[in-house]
């Protein structure tokens, strides 16, 4: 029995060593810090164990007083994206951050982008509004997204998404009932999600804890 215990200890140590070597390698070939690596893996689990509820809002058939298709935004490569290009498509808008426990959702958003080509558009809006978890400049953010998650969907210039004088016009539309027709809910944290349907109507809001690949999001996209 003693020999078996020692064997298990040795196996555990070897496994831990191998995992440590892999972690060092992964961090060397990416732009992630050790803090970012563990935060992305631990934070969602802690939130789930704590029983933190995730807000979900849904409202269909409400015509927005201000057309969604009049909006535009500047991408982080300085090109202007006119939202009139999204007619006939669903659009998922997400405020993002590189140093958040939910940053791993970039990978899920990229999967959505690839799963529904031509039917669903994913848009990322980096923001430093929540605990300053997006301190990098636009070039740094673009490199981080591409290198760590292979992001190919549009990422816009960093801006504020919460209500105030500096709120991005797109997020002013998303959070002002006078513009979108019904919703006043602002992002509760990084990776809050808003869904606009093929007719340019805001139909859903999902809190950060709701996975982009979660059943309710997929159902909303497939409706």
Give the positions of each predicted feature.
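N-terminal Sec-pathway targeting helices
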Residues: 1-16
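Membrane-interface motif at the C-terminal end of an N-terminal transmembrane signal
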Residues: 16-40
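N-terminal "domain-start" segment that seeds a small globular fold
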Residues: 43-83, 168-169
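Proline/glycine-enriched tight loop/beta-turn segments at coil->beta junctions
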Residues: 85-91
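Conserved hydrophobic packing residues within short motifs/helices of P-loop NTPase cores
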Residues: 91-93, 123, 194
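Amphipathic alpha-helical repeat scaffolds
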Residues: 95-99
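Structural microenvironment flanking redox-active thiols in thiol-disulfide oxidoreductases
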Residues: 102-167
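Thiol-/selenol-based redox modules, centered on thioredoxin-like
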Residues: 169-172, 176-223
């Amino acid at each position: 029995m003693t020999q078996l215990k020692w064997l298990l200890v040795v196996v555990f140590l070897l496994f831990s060593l191998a995992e440590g070597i892999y972690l060092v390698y992964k961090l060397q070939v990416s732009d992630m810090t050790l803090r970012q690596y563990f935060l992305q893996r631990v934070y969602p689990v802690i939130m789930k164990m704590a029983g933190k509820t995730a807000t979900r809002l849904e409202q269909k058939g409400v015509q927005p007083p201000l057309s969604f298709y009049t909006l535009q935004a500047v991408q982080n490569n300085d090109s202007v994206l006119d939202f009139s290009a999204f007619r006939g498509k669903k659009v998922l808008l997400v405020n993002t951050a590189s140093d958040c426990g939910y940053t791993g959702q970039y990978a899920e958003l990229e999967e959505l982008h690839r799963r529904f080509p031509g039917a669903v558009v994913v848009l990322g809006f980096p923001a430093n509004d929540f605990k300053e978890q997006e301190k990098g400049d636009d070039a740094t953010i673009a490199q981080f997204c591409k290198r760590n998650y292979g992001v190919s969907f549009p990422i816009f210039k960093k801006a504020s998404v919460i209500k105030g004088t500096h709120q991005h016009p797109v997020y002013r539309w998303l959070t002002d009932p006078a513009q979108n027709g019904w919703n006043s809910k602002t992002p509760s944290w990084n990776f809050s999600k808003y869904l606009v349907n093929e007719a340019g109507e805001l139909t859903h809001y999902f809190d950060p804890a709701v996975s982009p690949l979660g059943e309710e999001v997929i159902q909303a996209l497939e409706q």
